[in-house]
From Swiss-Prot:
Keyword Metal-binding (UniProt): no
Location in the cell: Cytoplasm
Family note: Belongs to the transaldolase family. Type 1 subfamily.
GO biological process: carbohydrate metabolic process; pentose-phosphate shunt
Domain of life: Bacteria
One function term, GO molecular function aspect: transaldolase activity
InterPro entries cross-referenced by the UniProt entry: Aldolase_TIM, TAL/FSA, Transaldolase_1, Transaldolase_AS
Entry protein name: Transaldolase
Active-site residues annotated for this sequence: 125
Pfam family, one: TAL_FSA
Assigned keywords, A-Z: Cytoplasm, Pentose shunt, Schiff base, Transferase
Pathway in which this enzyme or protein is active: Carbohydrate degradation; pentose phosphate pathway; D-glyceraldehyde 3-phosphate and beta-D-fructose 6-phosphate from D-ribose 5-phosphate and D-xylulose 5-phosphate (non-oxidative stage): step 2/3
Species annotation: Pseudomonas putida (strain ATCC 47054 / DSM 6125 / CFBP 8728 / NCIMB 11950 / KT2440)
Length: 308
């Protein structure tokens, strides 16, 4: 019997959710994703110490630019050991400023191209705010493909599909966390609200012919991953990838394109904002996620600023 990880790879593109080059080399994912929190974690790895000093020197004291250069350097290194693409995130503090998001995204792509990386191997990650979705729509028209992250609500998924974004990252574990805290209940298997959210989005996209890729993210256990086997892509931490690699049990495909989904519905800005207002979980987790990424971005800036 092959491992659950190898079985999963038969019907889902497996993505590593980490900036740890050693883990990526060992676990052999197709793609990789990073975010400000993962970059902060990577910055603590001794092997990156010289790189932090180098990007600070190259940026000539511009800490914001140094952070971008660090993200691109980490991403470029990862691309040397994976066949697919890297997702690099725009500063979360820009999440409600469409022009600033566009400028930052274009700057990241320019830095990648200066490092010899074609834009076709990069996905720009943006928070799934209304402004982030609109920025993504414009970037896609420019040939810059996007990954819409911090996606917790069905309304966000609907708006992303309408905008024609390349990929969305609906979060499973953080939805689970919210409901567990809110109700005091444990959720297992198909009863997990995070699993139900991604399943609903996947079925909606496939039923209505959307090309946007669904990449489930933010997992707390391999049970959640097993329930989403068959999803277009799943981005998984090295720890859970290792658990899947060590498990020789059977892993059947759960999500399939032929499953029934809801009828297509287009949302304008006011409808989107109202739907978000009515979704307490989605609103709280989006705001919390942006705050957390913003804090970690500030910590990374401080870390780089303090480097000799």
């Amino acid at each position: 019997m092959t491992s659950k990880l190898e079985q999963l790879k038969q019907f889902t593109t497996v993505v590593a959710d980490t900036g740890d080059l050693d883990a990526i080399t060992r676990l052999k994912p197709v793609d990789a994703t990073t975010n400000p929190s993962l970059l902060l974690k990577a910055a603590a790895i001794p092997g990156y110490a010289d790189l932090l000093k180098q990007v600070k020197a190259d940026a000539k004291g511009n800490v914001d630019l140094a952070c971008d250069k660090f993200a691109v350097a980490v991403g470029s290194g990862i691309l040397k050991v994976i066949p697919g693409r890297i997702s690099t995130e725009v500063d979360a503090r820009l999440s409600f400023d469409e022009p600033a998001l566009l400028n930052k995204a274009r700057q990241l792509i320019a830095l990648y191209e200066a490092a010899g990386v074609a834009k076709e191997r990069v996905l720009i990650k943006l928070a799934s705010t209304w402004e982030g979705i609109r920025a993504a729509e414009q970037l896609e028209k420019e040939g810059i493909q996007t990954n819409l992250t911090l996606l917790f609500s069905f309304a966000q998924a609907q708006a992303c599909a309408d905008a024609g974004v390349f990929l969305i990252s609906p979060f499973v574990g953080r939805i689970y966390d919210w409901y567990k805290k809110s109700t005091g209940q444990e959720y297992v298997g198909a009863e997990d609200p995070g699993v139900q959210s991604v399943t609903r989005i996947y079925n909606y996209y496939k039923a209505n012919g959307y090309n946007t890729v669904v990449m489930g993210a933010s997992f707390r256990n391999i049970g959640q991953i097993e329930q989403l086997a068959g999803c277009d892509r799943l981005t998984i931490s090295p720890e859970l990838l290792q658990q899947l690699s060590d498990d020789q049990g059977e892993l059947p495909q759960v999500l399939k394109p032929g499953n029934a989904g809801e009828a297509k519905q287009h949302l304008n800005e006011s409808q989107f904002r109202w739907a978000m207002n009515e979704d307490a979980m989605g609103t709280e987790k989006l705001a919390e996620g942006i705050r957390q990424f913003a804090r970690d971005q500030e910590k990374l800036e401080k870390l780089i600023a303090e480097k000799a």
